[in-house]
């Protein structure tokens, strides 16, 4: 392993994530928060829910009650006046269903003088859920979507119609109270109704789109689920104010700044990366190989969210798969590619992403690993683990997509 490039990669990752932690962003958004005089209740859902709720309560001083539902391992302590719950992600589970019921109970019977402060971040689609189909069926549909290669907008178009809280329905539960929503974006282009499936946003998608997506990916659905896909979601809400804060562009900007501080010339390729993970990795590897050996320190940055079409039975995540796919192009070069999820988790693993450099492919061969067979089995985790290429950050408290960087010396 090229220890110099790995050290630079770790520093860039740390600086980038620190720049997009939600604490300051939530406080800025609350400058426009003006309760009407009644009760103020807090509901937070998503991978960054605890961090956002903690910042909000510190800024406000107190709330009259609250519920946080976040991913396992993401609650970092007690928040005064708020009950915190952990649940399953990316597949919803019974703990998430129960926590959502607690949130719904909290907002029942409110008046027009009351306010619900709704803090939303990526991961909310799985974590904040009251299914309209049996829980086991929803889990099965979620697994089908995850394995299909469907993008997040397609997935959430389906999930909205199978839920009693998504697609604007949570805001309807809160009425006549006002909902003040602060959203940390994890979807390219910041479509509010798709982030965590838009529990407090009118739905822009149509039932015809949902039915087409189900057909496109050959989803195995019950008659009940098919009937729900054919029903429309709320198209207008009059009790919601929404502010978006944080995005993948901020993550990319922070990464570029960190690269410059380490002496690299930074080039932002895109903040809308959306393709197969291994295609993105091969592309970044090819860019790095083209520019290696020219005597210039360069950093090529891409932010977004790739997808993985599961065909194998291995372990990994989109960022690990992206990194591993870059390894062949980097072989023998003084260059590296790394990719991380800003939330600190990549797929169903304990890693945030992966790192490879010009020495990785040879190290994999020595360990009895073939890059292409490993990718075909979707087993990037074990391959990178064998050569020290896993990136572990732990839960970060934020969630604004992924960032991938190619470094050239």
Question: Language-model features: where?
Answer:
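Internal helix-turn-beta structural module
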Residues: 324-409
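A glycine- and small-aliphatic-rich helix-loop capping segment at beta-alpha/alpha-beta transitions
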Residues: 55-65, 79-84, 104, 108, ...
């Amino acid at each position: 392993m090229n220890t110099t490039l790995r050290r630079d990669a770790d520093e860039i990752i740390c600086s980038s994530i620190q720049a997009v932690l939600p604490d300051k962003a939530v406080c800025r958004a609350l400058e426009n928060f003006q309760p009407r005089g009644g009760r103020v209740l807090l509901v937070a859902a998503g991978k960054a829910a605890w961090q956002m709720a903690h910042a909000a309560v510190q800024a406000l001083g107190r709330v009259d009650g609250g519920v946080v539902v976040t991913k396992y391992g993401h609650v970092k302590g007690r928040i005064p006046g708020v009950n915190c719950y952990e649940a399953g992600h990316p597949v919803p589970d019974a703990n998430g269903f129960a926590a959502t019921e607690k949130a719904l109970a909290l907002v029942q019977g409110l008046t027009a003088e009351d306010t619900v402060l709704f803090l939303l971040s990526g991961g909310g689609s799985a974590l904040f859920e009251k299914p309209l189909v049996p829980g086991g069926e929803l889990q099965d549909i979620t697994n089908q979507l995850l394995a299909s290669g469907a993008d997040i907008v397609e997935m959430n178009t389906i999930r909205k119609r199978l839920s009693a809280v998504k697609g604007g329905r949570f805001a309807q539960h809160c009425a006549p109270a006002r909902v003040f929503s602060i959203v940390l974006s994890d979807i390219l282009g910041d479509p509010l109704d798709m982030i965590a499936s838009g529990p407090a946003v009118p739905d822009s998608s149509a039932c015809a789109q949902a039915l087409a997506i189900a057909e496109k990916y050959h989803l195995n659905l019950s008659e009940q689920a098919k009937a729900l896909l054919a029903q429309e979601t709320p198209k207008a809400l009059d009790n919601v104010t929404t502010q978006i804060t944080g995005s993948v562009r901020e993550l990319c900007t922070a990464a570029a700044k960190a690269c410059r501080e380490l002496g690299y010339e930074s080039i932002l390729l895109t903040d809308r990366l959306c393709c197969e993970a291994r295609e993105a990795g091969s592309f970044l590897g090819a860019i790095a190989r083209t520019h290696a050996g020219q005597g210039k320190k360069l950093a090529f940055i891409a932010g977004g969210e790739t997808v993985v079409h599961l065909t194998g039975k291995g372990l990994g995540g989109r960022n690990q798969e992206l990194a591993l796919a870059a390894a062949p192009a980097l072989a023998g070069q003084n260059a590296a590619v790394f990719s991380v999820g800003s939330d600190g988790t990549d797929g169903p693993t304990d890693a945030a992403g992966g790192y490879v450099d010009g020495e990785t492919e040879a190290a994999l061969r020595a360990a009895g690993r073939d890059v292409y067979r490993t990718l075909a089995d979707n087993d990037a985790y074990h391959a990178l683990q064998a050569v020290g290429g896993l990136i572990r950050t732990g839960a970060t408290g934020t969630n604004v997509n992924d960032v991938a960087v190619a470094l050239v010396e």
